[in-house]
């Protein structure tokens, strides 16, 4: 399967909140996830953590995608429902090996999250 198809399958499963199907897109060994607020080196633990996001996910829209070899980049708008709807821009970088995602990196402005959990450095 082409890298873009693997990552698109993962995102579609995430949109449907089908975390079992999303997990099937991730490598069993050597998986890595990095974001401004979390990091995981175990796909099962990562998917368990995504349940919370799924509970508040309202919409996930792809604005742009491109592929370079085994690397796939998506620019996404993610809308969550927390005290009303909030939409944030997120860049997801994925590396595919074989038919599985071995690395995900999410790049986004985490200042709202840090304010929500009471990070005093953000005023």
Model-derived features: positions:
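C-terminal and inter-domain tail/linker signature
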Residues: 1-123
């Amino acid at each position: 399967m082409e890298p873009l198809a693997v990552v698109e399958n993962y995102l579609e499963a995430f949109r449907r909140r089908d975390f079992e199907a999303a997990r099937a897109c991730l490598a069993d060994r050597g998986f890595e996830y990095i974001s401004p607020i979390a990091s995981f080196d175990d796909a099962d633990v990562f998917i368990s953590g995504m349940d919370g996001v799924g509970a508040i996910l309202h919409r996930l829209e792809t604005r742009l995608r491109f592929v370079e070899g085994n690397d796939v980049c998506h620019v996404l708008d993610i809308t969550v429902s927390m005290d009303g709807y909030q939409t944030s821009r997120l860049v997801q970088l994925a590396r595919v090996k074989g038919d599985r995602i071995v690395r995900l990196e999410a790049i986004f402005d985490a200042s709202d999250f840090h304010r929500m959990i009471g990070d005093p450095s953000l005023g």
